[in-house]
Amino acid sequence: MSNAVKRSTDPTVFSPPRQFSFLRHAAVLKRRGVSRSKHYADIQAGLYPKPVAIGPRAVAYPDYEVDLLNAAKIAGKSEDEIRALVAKLHAARGAALSS
């Protein structure tokens, strides 16, 4: 039997991977295919998670969050569903340290 974590095909079901990498801002914009202003507008509207501080003057995004949100868009999720997903992602960030 495999030790691999079984991933859901539903983009609203969150299961963080055991390994991930951080994507810097330019890489996120490229993966999303949006402008810088649209990206920040989505963050303000709750449609995209806030970046994670990785240094005193550097921020990035966990790659799995970017992929999960892209999958939600592809699946045709509504803005309300995406806001709920973003809220789950933010909550999971805090819960990761407490487990």
Model-assigned labels for residue ranges:
Residues 67-97:
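A short, Lys/Arg-enriched interface patch at domain edges and termini
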Residues 1-8, 89-99:
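Glycine- and charge-rich intrinsically disordered segments
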